């Protein structure tokens, strides 16, 4: 039995939400070249990100400091609740698979180039 895939437009690209149950969520983030998600953290949401296509710069909080590194196809990272993070797509854009707990609206934005709060 298939489930509905929902497309959600974002200022940086779009999300394809392919699963959202009371236990987990799954989506693909399509980020256009050079576009960025907000610097953010989640109070409850626990997520793992897998880079399917392209590359991106990941800024991730490590021991209280923000560290940035380039992520390449096939790499995965876990982002636990309370961890500040941001993704900026490389010159080809990127597609990221996100698997998480179900709290999709749990986003605390700290900085956002599109003026969202």
Segments the model singles out, each with a brief description of its role:
Residues 44-62:
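Glycine- and acidic-residue-biased ligand/ion/polar-headgroup-sensing regions
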Residues 3-10, 88-117:
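Double-stranded beta-helix
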Residues 62-82:
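Short acidic-glycine-tyrosine-enriched beta hairpin
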Residues 36-38, 57, 75-87:
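Histidine-centered metal-chelating micro-motifs
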Residues 3-45:
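A short glycine-rich, His/Asp/Glu-containing loop-to-beta-strand
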Residues 28, 48, 68-69:
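Short, surface-exposed secondary-structure edge patches
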Residues 35, 44-45, 83, 92-93, ...:
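A generic "binding-loop/recognition-motif" signal
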Residues 41-43, 50-51, 89-92:
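Short glycine/proline-enriched turns and hinge-like loops at secondary-structure junctions
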């Amino acid at each position: 039995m298939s489930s509905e895939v929902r497309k959600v437009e974002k200022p940086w690209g779009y999300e394809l939400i392919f699963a959202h149950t009371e236990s987990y969520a799954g989506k693909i983030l399509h980020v256009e070249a050079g576009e960025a998600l907000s610097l953010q953290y989640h109070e409850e949401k626990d997520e793992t990100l897998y880079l399917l296509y392209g590359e991106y710069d990941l800024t991730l909080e490590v021991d209280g400091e923000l560290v940035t590194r380039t992520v390449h196809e096939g790499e995965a990272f876990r982002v636990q609740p309370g961890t500040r993070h941001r993704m900026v797509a490389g010159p080809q854009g990127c597609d990221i698979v996100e698997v998480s707990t179900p709290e999709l609206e749990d986003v605390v934005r700290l900085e956002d180039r599109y003026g969202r709060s």
